[in-house]
Amino acid sequence: MAHAGGTGYDNREIVMKYIHYKLSQRGYEWDAGDAGAAPPGAAPAPGILSSQPGRTPAPSRTSPPPPPAAAAGPAPSPVPPVVHLTLRQAGDDFSRRYRRDFAEMSSQLHLTPFTARERFATVVEELFRDGVNWGRIVAFFEFGGVMCVESVNREMSPLVDSIALWMTEYLNRHLHTWIQDNGGWDAFVELYGPSMRPLFDFSWLSLKALLSLALVGACITLGAYLGHK
């Protein structure tokens, strides 16, 4: 598999395709738009959400204010399909293991356009409070996917654009350096791909109890999911 070099892969593309996949699992389609890749430090352009025939049409989108321009730099590399596939498989495994807990979380998030960003920031801050590892990065993607699905279920489709932007910003600003220092997404594929070691070869913490803390306004940590770099 080709390596991305010093710039890494396009985090925006990884986020957009992951969200598209999670929404498609529930019968929704998402057009992420035609904006170019956002390099680390820059925010992406939001996309447009639509539903399949028979679904309630998405309300019109209000775009967030444009972010400050980022300094010019090398463009990130296109993302190999195997990266998307491995991340999807890891997220699906995570979701299956905690299916009931995620269902309860979805029903209790009480997302609104006014609370969504605070919910996102609180969970993500606590998720990475004790450091970064690949498991927590997968949990980050899966939590973002849950927020997007719940937003559409509650007829707040424009929030999907914002969640995608927040995820990309966080990856670019806070996780990109760790990812590159630990071999990039290529290392994730090599460590956790189909022919490599199982994803779940360690003890898991109780996600249900930790999510319950978040839902009453306390901090949340998703624990040592994967538990390794």
Curated annotation (Swiss-Prot):
* Motif placement: BH4: 10-30
Among the record's GO biological process terms, what is one?
autophagy
SUPFAM superfamilies linked to this entry: Bcl-2 inhibitors of programmed cell death
User: Which ranges are annotated Low complexity under compositional bias?
Assistant: 33-61
Pfam families, sorted: Bcl-2 (PF00452), BH4 (PF02180)
- Describe the processing and modification events after translation: Phosphorylation/dephosphorylation on Ser-63 regulates anti-apoptotic activity. Growth factor-stimulated phosphorylation on Ser-63 by PKC is required for the anti-apoptosis activity and occurs during the G2/M phase of the cell cycle. In the absence of growth factors, BCL2 appears to be phosphorylated by other protein kinases such as ERKs and stress-activated kinases. Phosphorylated by MAPK8/JNK1 at Thr-62, Ser-63 and Ser-77, which stimulates starvation-induced autophagy. Dephosphorylated by protein phosphatase 2A (PP2A). Proteolytically cleaved by caspases during apoptosis. The cleaved protein, lacking the BH4 motif, has pro-apoptotic activity, causes the release of cytochrome c into the cytosol promoting further caspase activity.
Membrane topology note: Single-pass membrane protein
Q: Where is this motif: BH1?
A: 126-145
Region Disordered: list its residue ranges. Answer: 30-82
Indicate whether Cell wall biogenesis/degradation appears among the record's keywords: no
Annotated disulfide bonds: none
Write down which residues bear the modification named Phosphoserine. Answer: S63, S77
Its localization reads:
Mitochondrion outer membrane; Nucleus membrane; Endoplasmic reticulum membrane; Cytoplasm
Membrane spanning stretches: 202-223
Motif BH3: where in chain = 83-97
Enumerate composition-biased segments (Pro residues): 62-81
Membrane: is it a keyword of this entry?
A: yes
Keyword list (alphabetical) reads: Apoptosis, Autophagy, Cytoplasm, Endoplasmic reticulum, Membrane, Mitochondrion, Mitochondrion outer membrane, Nucleus, Phosphoprotein, Transmembrane, Transmembrane helix, Ubl conjugation
Q: What terms describe the molecular function in GO for this protein? A: channel activity
> What job does this protein perform?
Suppresses apoptosis in a variety of cell systems including factor-dependent lymphohematopoietic and neural cells. Regulates cell death by controlling the mitochondrial membrane permeability. Appears to function in a feedback loop system with caspases. Inhibits caspase activity either by preventing the release of cytochrome c from the mitochondria and/or by binding to the apoptosis-activating factor (APAF-1). Also acts as an inhibitor of autophagy: interacts with BECN1 and AMBRA1 during non-starvation conditions and inhibits their autophagy function.
Question: Quaternary form?
Answer: Forms homodimers, and heterodimers with BAX, BAD, BAK and Bcl-X(L). Heterodimerization with BAX requires intact BH1 and BH2 motifs, and is necessary for anti-apoptotic activity. Component of the complex, at least composed of LRPPRC, BECN1 and BCL2; the interactions prevent BECN1 from forming an autophagy-inducing complex with PIK3C3. Interacts with EI24. Also interacts with APAF1, BBC3, BCL2L1, BNIPL, MRPL41 and TP53BP2. Binding to FKBP8 seems to target BCL2 to the mitochondria and probably interferes with the binding of BCL2 to its targets. Interacts with BAG1 in an ATP-dependent manner.
Looking up PANTHER family in the UniProt record yields: APOPTOSIS REGULATOR BCL-2, BCL-2 RELATED
Q: What is this protein called?
A: Apoptosis regulator Bcl-2
Q: Which organism does this sequence originate in? A: Bos taurus
Q: What is the lineage of its organism?
A: Eukaryota, Metazoa, Chordata, Craniata, Vertebrata
Q: Which gene encodes it?
A: BCL2
